[in-house]
Amino acid sequence: MLITRLRVPTIKRPLLPITSHLVRHCIRTYVATNHGNVRPFITPYKSSLPVRCLIAQRHIRTFPSNDKFTTKASNIETILLRKNNEREFKQSLLADAKNFQERFKINLKWILIKNNRPFSLNEISIIASWLILSQILWLILSTTTFISFYLFVINSVFSQEYIHEKKIYERLLKWLLKDHKCSNQDLEITFSPEDKASMLVLSPDWESNSILIKRLNVRDEILDLDLKFHHINLNVSLKNWLLGRGLITNVSIYGIRGCLNLSNFINLVNSFQGDQKTENFLKTLNNVEITDSEILLKQSLSAQETPSLKFSIYNLSLPRLRLNHFISDILSAKTFSGSINNSLFNLFKRQQKLTAVIENNNKNRMASSKFDFTDNNQENYRTVTHQDDPNYVTTLRLNFININDLKFNGDGKFNWLKDGQVEILADIMLTNSTSHLSSESKYAVVDLKVTCRDLKTTFPQEPPVLSTGDSIVSLDELKPIITFINSYEGMANPILKDFSENERLTNSIIWNSPNVSINRQRKSYPLTTKVTSNSTKEIIKFHNQPNTNANEIVLRCKMVKNLSDLQLININQILDQITMELYVDLTKIVEDWEFKNKNDWMKQWGTTFASQLLLFGFGAMV
C-alpha cells in the first residue's frame, strides 16, 4: 500500500466539544510511533450522522487495529451518537410544544433527568431533598436575604389592601411574642400607613440588606406603653441563633414617639433576662442605632398626676447591647446625645492615649533638644496603648436641669429639697469586657461631680430614707444641712444678688418696650460703687467675688462597682450607694462650715471682750 507523508491532521475543539481531546491524544500517539506516517483516508460510507461524527469516524478508521484502542474509539462513537439522538429528540419536543409552560417543563426535565418521561419516586425524593437542603443552607448563611425574598413574594402576590385587611403581619409579630413572659392579650401591634393601598409596611430593603418595618405602633395598657416607630431596619442571622447569640443582630430605629412608664420598662427588661425565648431573640445585638426619637417618661404609677419627663435621643450608636449588661453597654456607646426636658446631655469617650503621648513628648522636649521624636512617639504610643488597652474612660455630662424634673424630691432620698438646679458630670472608667480577665477583676470606677445651684429647702415631716426603707440621716442631723443651704445664698454674696435682681428688672423693662435693642456690654469692675455710703452692706465682697455663680454647692464622690453588679436589676442599689456618698460629702461641707463659723464667732467674741476690757481699764485709770 502506498504510504504518503502528510501533515498531522488538526481536529478543532468546536467539532468535537465533548471527547475531542481523547481523539487528538490517540492521533498524536500513533503519529509519534510511525514517525509521522499515517494511512490514507478511507472514503466513509453514506450515513445520516452529522459532519463532526463522520469526521471522527474517518480519523478513527485510519488507526491500526488494536483491541484497547478499538474499545475506546467505539465508546467515543457511542457517546457521540447518544448525545446526538438526545439533542434531536429534545429539538423535536420543543418544536411540538405549544406554549411557554410546556417548553419550560421540557427544559426543566432535560436539566434534571435528560428525558421527557415522568419522574420516578427516587428522582422526586432526590429533587425534594436537594431543594430542602439548599433552602436550609440559604436560611443559615443568609437569613436576612432569605426572609426578604419571601416578603417580596408575599408583597408581589397579595395586594396591600388585602394584607392590611387580614392583618397578616400583625398576626406574625404577635405570634413571635406570644410565648414571652411579659406578653399578654393586652399587647396591641398595629400599622398606620399613610396610604394603605400602596405603602409596604413590611418589605425588604435591598440596598442595606435588611428588613424594613414602617409605621409600627405598639401599645399595652398594663405596662403603660404606647410607642410609635417611623421605621425600623432589622438584620437577622440564624447562624448566630444556633451559636446562642440571638436571632436579631443589627437594629436601626428612626423616629420613636410616645410615652413609657420608666419603672415598668425597668421591670420589663429585668424580666427578659430570665426569659429563654427573649434571650434567643435579643441576647446580643451587635449594632444598635436610635435616631431622632422623643419619649415621655412617666416616673410613677400615678402618671396622670405627675408630669412626664421629656427624654429626647438625637443620636445613639451602640457597638453591642446585651440584656445582662444593659447599663455597661449603654455607657460604652460610641455616641449618645440627647436632652432631658430641653437640658442637653452627652456621652463621649475621652482621648486618654493622645493626651498621654503629648505629655510625654513635651517632657522629653524640655529634657533634651537632641531627641529622636519619631522613635519615642512610637514607643510612647505602644506603652500607653498597652497600659490603657483594658480600660477606657467615658464622660457623661448633663447640663443644669431643675430638680423637680429629675424628681429628686419625689422619692424619699431628697424629700427636703424644694427647688433648685443641678448639673451632673461623671467620669466612668469601664474595664474592657473582652479582655482576658476574670469576672471578679472587671469593674467600673465612677468619679461623680454634682453642682447644685439656687437650692431651696423645707423641713420634712419624715427623715430621708433609701429604697430599702433604711434611714439616711435623722431629722436632728438634717437641721444643720437645711440651715446651711438656706443661709448659703444670702451669705455668699448679698450685694451681687441685689445687683442681679436689679439687672433682670431693667432687662425686663427694656424687653417689654416696643423699641427693642440688644446692647452687649463688656463685663468689668465698676469704677464707682452703686451702694450709698450709709449702707450696712460690705463692698469688699462685691470686688472680690464678681461672678454670679457664688451660690453653687459642688458635691463629689467616687464609687467602684463590679461589672456583674452593674445591671438594671440592681439600679436601686446603685442609686442608694450614690446617695449615701453625696450625703457624706454634703455632711463634710456642713461640718467645715460650722467649724468656720464657730472660729469666726470665737475670734469676734475674743476681740470684743478684749476691747471692752481695754476700754474699762482706761476708764478706771482715769
Swiss-Prot record:
Question: What is the protein's membrane topology class?
Answer: Multi-pass membrane protein
Q: How does it assemble?
A: Interacts with MDM31. Participates in a complex of about 175 kDa.
This protein's GO CC annotations: mitochondrial inner membrane; mitochondrion
Record-given protein name: Mitochondrial distribution and morphology protein 32
The UniProt similarity line reads:
Belongs to the MDM31/MDM32 family.
User: InterPro entries, per this entry?
Assistant: Mdm31/Mdm32
Please give the superkingdom of this protein's source.
Eukaryota
